[in-house]
Amino acid sequence: SGWVAKIYQIQGGDAFNNKDYATASEIFAKGYAADPDNTGMALNLAMSYCEMAMSSGDMSQYEKGMEIYEAVAAKTHPKYAEDAAKAKEDMALYTNNMVAKMQAANDFDGIIKMADDLLAKNPQSALAQNVRLQAYANKKDYAKVIELGQAAADVQTDPADKSLMYYLLGAAYNAKEMKPQAIAAFKQVT
């Protein structure tokens, strides 16, 4: 119920503001269970999980956060519009942060696994398709880039991201000495 959730939101707020994300997530999780439509609290819960994942590298925390962000992002009622937009922003932010962390460790397989897990839940995730294609390109797995490149380009909504997918695809064709395909892909780069 709504008022129970509000109590948890207030209790969790102190811990959250003090960046005690472990405590905050425990309290917010109870509130979220009581009222999944309290999107403000849901966002704080998701952020708590993602912050813990960033400091510990625990992918299960990251996945919990993404699941909640996905749920908020999927809400279509106009009253949720602002929080749904924020959920999408934060998903991109934390995914990119996690990717950067893994890239620094040259953990391209970790990035691919993370993207595959996201795509299992949401096959149309432009973000997951994007980071996965970049990881395969960084691994120089050109066959995989060629296999996945067009689908990755097709789901991108941002023209710059779409361009990057075609650029990676063109570079992969080029590396495989497939000149006509490389030229065709590079022509799609804006």
Please tell me what each predicted stretch does.
Residues G2, Q9, L43, M47-C50, ...:
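TPR/TPR-like alpha-solenoid signature
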Residues G13, M47, E51-M54, A100, ...:
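Residue-level recognition of tetratricopeptide repeat
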Residues N18, M52, S56-M59, A105, ...:
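Structural motif corresponding to the intra-repeat A-B loop/turn of tetratricopeptide repeats
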Residues G31, V72, D117-L118, A151-A152, ...:
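Canonical positions in the second alpha-helix
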Residues P36-D37, H77, P123, T157-A160:
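Short coil turns that delineate tetratricopeptide repeat
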Residues M41, Y80-D83, A87, Y94, ...:
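TPR alpha-solenoid repeat register
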